[in-house]
């Protein structure tokens, strides 16, 4: 296996891994790839499902590769020029084949959103699947998915994969690495389209067996994110929410990794009144705490995805992304009375290097109004509905008596 080309994806092997006749090599590790020796060849790349010819050419020697890198049931045909019967005729067949899905090593939310599609892919094709990702997420997921091999990108175990797929966020209108722009379908569902499986969302499986430790009703919150546009930028919002939660009888625990986060002159701090449960802890410890929370309140960030996977209600506050950009929750908080949805606007490209990115209103009094216009009263209204629902189910009354809801 070749080394990392960048910090995101594993590059394909230098030579295709499958040997055909006449010293022809091919594989599906960067779309369909064929490496031809000296000769007079005619090559066709087809979509085996539609039987459309995607590309054909005459070539004397060298490479023929598809422009499409996502899952297509490719058919590769290699003819000697002038002959009607192909010397090589190979249709993609993944059953029992070594297959690699390369994920970026990046953020928690991306991986938790994407990974269920990898499991769906393995179940569909019955391939020998390896997935590469960061070690902390491997530690969280691997015990729940014994049929899949996990590794970090610098130490892949599959040395000669038959096929490789790279799941990530592709900007700039890229439709070679994804069949549809992720901003049109929601970033997590894009993985389903890249892998050619059912794009309906599903939470990852987690170990939810930890016993309840805190007997009082409590709510977990996460207020930090990776850029200012993702924050809840209402100045008094969190303090209003925390005060309201306490009036309802909840302890409020902030579980961000960082109590303080920002760049340059803009920094965000743990909200006053929340109990400080911040810190760089193993993800399983976060799961153990979330599992027994009455509910979670957060942003379009990784901890919201983690909370969703623990099967507790999630109040998700966002204006930076559209309501269908993340998993469905009936407790989503969104305000349509100002600017919103820049993340999902295909005419814009997110600038990962600009912490204060606000493409339509930066340096104006409308900057970050997508969440600034979401008031504490609006969020508290959603909390009231959720609290009433839990009370009607008898959940909160049981907890107030100090009895576990297990």
From Swiss-Prot:
Subunit structure: Homododecamer composed of 6 homodimers forming a ring.
Catalytic activity, EC: 2.4.99.-
Cofactor(s) named in the record: Fe(3+)
Record-given protein name: Autotransporter heptosyltransferase TibC
One Pfam entry name: TibC_1st
List of catalytic residues: 110 (proton acceptor)
Name of the gene encoding the protein in the UniProt record: tibC
Family to which the UniProt record says this protein belongs: Belongs to the glycosyltransferase 9 family.
Keywords: Glycosyltransferase, Iron, Metal-binding, Transferase
Upper taxonomic lineage: Bacteria, Pseudomonadati, Pseudomonadota, Gammaproteobacteria, Enterobacterales
Catalytic activity: ADP-D-glycero-beta-D-manno-heptose + L-seryl-[protein] = O-(D-glycero-alpha-D-manno-heptosyl)-L-seryl-[protein] + ADP + H(+)
Miscellaneous information on this protein: Able to functionally replace the autotransporter adhesin heptosyltransferase (AAH) of the AIDA system in fully restoring activity to the AIDA-I adhesin depending on the modification of AIDA-I with heptose residues.
């Amino acid at each position: 296996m070749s080394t990392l080309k960048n910090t995101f994806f594993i590059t394909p092997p230098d030579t295709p891994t499958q040997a055909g006749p006449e010293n022809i090599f091919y594989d599906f590790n960067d779309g369909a790839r064929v490496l031809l020796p000296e000769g007079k060849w005619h090559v066709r790349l087809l979509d085996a499902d539609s039987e459309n010819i995607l590309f054909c050419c005459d070539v004397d020697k060298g490479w023929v590769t598809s422009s499409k890198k996502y899952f297509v049931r490719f058919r590769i045909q290699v003819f000697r020029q002038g002959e009607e019967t192909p010397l090589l005729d190979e249709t993609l067949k993944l059953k029992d084949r070594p297959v690699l899905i390369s994920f970026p090593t990046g953020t928690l939310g991306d991986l938790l959103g994407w990974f269920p599609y990898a499991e769906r892919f393995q179940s569909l094709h019955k391939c020998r699947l390896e997935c590469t990702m960061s070690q902390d997420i491997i530690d969280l997921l691997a015990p729940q998915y014994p049929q899949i091999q996990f590794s970090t990108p610098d130490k892949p175990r599959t040395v000669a994969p038959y096929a490789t797929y790279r799941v990530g966020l592709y900007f700039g209108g890229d439709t070679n690495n994804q069949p549809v722009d992720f901003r049109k379908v929601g970033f997590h569902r894009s993985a389903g389209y890249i892998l050619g499986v059912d794009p309906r969302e599903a939470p990852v499986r987690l170990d939810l067996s930890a016993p309840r430790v805190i007997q009082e009703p409590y709510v977990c919150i996460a207020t930090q994110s990776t850029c200012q546009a993702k924050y809840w930028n209402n100045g008094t919002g969190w303090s209003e929410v925390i005060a309201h939660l306490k009036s309802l009888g909840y302890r409020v625990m902030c579980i961000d990794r960082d109590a303080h986060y920002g760049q340059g002159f803009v920094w965000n701090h743990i909200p006053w009144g929340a109990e400080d449960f911040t810190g760089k802890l193993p993800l399983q410890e976060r799961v153990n705490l979330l599992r027994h929370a009455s509910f979670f309140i957060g942003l379009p960030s990784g901890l919201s995805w983690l909370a969703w996977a623990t099967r507790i209600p999630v109040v998700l506050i966002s204006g930076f992304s559209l309501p269908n950009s993340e998993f469905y929750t009936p407790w989503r908080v969104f305000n349509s009375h100002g600017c919103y949805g820049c993340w999902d606007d295909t005419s814009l490209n997110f600038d990962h290097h600009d912490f204060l990115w606000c493409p339509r209103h930066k340096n104006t009094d409308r900057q970050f109004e997508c969440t600034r216009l979401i008031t504490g009263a609006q969020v508290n209204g959603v909390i009231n509905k959720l609290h009433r629902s839990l009370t009607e189910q008898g959940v909160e009354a049981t907890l107030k008596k100090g009895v576990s809801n297990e």
